[in-house]
Amino acid sequence: MPKQKSHSGASKRFRITGSGKVVRQKANRRHLLEHKSSRRTRRLAGVEPLTKADAGRIKRLLAR
C-alpha cells in the first residue's frame, strides 16, 4: 500500500493547533496596504479558526 500524502495546497494554507483546531490566515493583508486603514490591517492580523464543517474536510486533506 502506498504512503498517504497530504494535500500540498492545503498544507500551505492551514495549520492544526495543539488542541486540534484548524486555523487559517485572514485574506486581504498581502499587498496594496497603503489605502487600507491601520484599524483594518490590525483586524486582519492573526489567525481565524475554521468552522466545524470545514475543519473536518481540511483535516482529511492534511491526512490527519
From Swiss-Prot:
Q: Which residues form a coiled coil?
A: none
Signal peptide residue numbers: none
Q: Which UniProt keywords apply?
A: Ribonucleoprotein, Ribosomal protein
Q: Which GO terms describe its biological process?
A: translation
According to the lineage, what is the superkingdom? Answer: Bacteria
Q: Identify the HAMAP family for this entry.
A: Ribosomal_bL35
Q: What is this protein called?
A: Large ribosomal subunit protein bL35
Gene name, per UniProt, is rpmI
